[in-house]
A protein has these predicted regions:
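Bacterial N-terminal signal peptides that target proteins for export
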Residues: 1-8
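Bacterial N-terminal signal peptides
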Residues: 8-17
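N-terminal soluble domains immediately following signal/targeting peptides that reside
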Residues: 21-156
Length: 156
């Protein structure tokens, strides 16, 4: 069932991006559970031009990383088993057309329910589509976020 959701998400992205004349905006986030440190590690890939427009600062400008950190903290919330988790920004990296953003939530021993609010770029780009892929103890889950559906949850 989970592989079907993942394939559907990828197919949806492909179909939406192949439409002629339509702008397409997306982000991808990978969430990995590290059992040894009881940490959820987030890696988010954003389009450089889109995030620069949203935070109104160019990546080569001093203070870009601080603005990205502030933006992520404002637009992402994580709840594990109903309890809010503090996200710690661990860095970002500009690589041409992509900005990679890294953050984590510590103190996660077991997950039966994971709820995420991801409104990254949804205010700036109404057609924005955010995909979050989660790996937890051998299980894979996928969440999709769009304007009007900024919050999603999965069960393990």
């Amino acid at each position: 069932m989970n592989i079907k959701l993942y394939i559907f998400a990828l197919l949806s992205i492909f179909l939406m991006s192949s439409s002629t004349g339509a702008d397409f905006y997306s982000s991808m986030t990978k969430v990995d559970y590290v059992e040894g440190s009881k940490t959820l590690k987030f890696t988010t890939k954003l389009n450089t031009e889109h995030i620069s427009s949203a935070i109104k600062i160019r990546p080569e400008t001093a203070g870009f990383e601080a603005e990205v950190k502030r933006y992520v903290n404002k637009n992402v919330d994580v709840y594990v088993n109903g309890s809010a988790k503090t996200l710690t920004f661990t860095g970002s990296q500009v690589n041409g057309e992509s900005v990679w953003v890294y953050f984590e939530a510590k103190g996660v021993s077991e997950i039966s329910q994971l709820k995420i609010r991801n409104s990254i770029l949804l205010e700036t780009y109404p057609k924005q589509f955010n995909v979050v892929n989660i790996a937890y103890k051998g299980q894979q889950k996928t969440m999709n976020f769009t304007r009007g559906r900024e919050t999603n949850q999965v069960e393990f």
